[in-house]
Amino acid sequence: MKMIIKNEWETPDAIPAKDIDLEHFSEEVELLIPEMDAFGVIREVKRIGYYHLQAHQWFVFSEDNTREELCSRVLAWRYLS
């Protein structure tokens, strides 16, 4: 059975598909998360991340893509196109 992946935003309650090569990780996805700027204004930003299936937590990659950070609030996610 072939899985059909749509490029639509999903709620954080829906979990992305498991990565084929990594046992406890989902596929990398685009996340929509709230972020506060230097002036205290909260805005929605898009970041690349994944869901850890064993820890039941979202993680995002830092903006320079050198490290992973725990993400406590995810507004939505979608598969990378």
Regions found by a protein language model. Name each.
Residues 70-81:
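Short, structured beta-strand segments at or near domain termini in extracellular proteins/domains
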Residues 2-24:
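Surface-exposed ligand/attachment interfaces on beta-rich extracellular proteins
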Residues 29-63, 67-68:
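Acidic, low-complexity, intrinsically disordered interaction modules
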Residues 16-19, 51, 78:
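Short stretches within intrinsically disordered, low-complexity N-terminal or propeptide regions
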Residues 26-28, 74:
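Exposed beta-strand and adjacent loop surfaces of beta-rich binding modules
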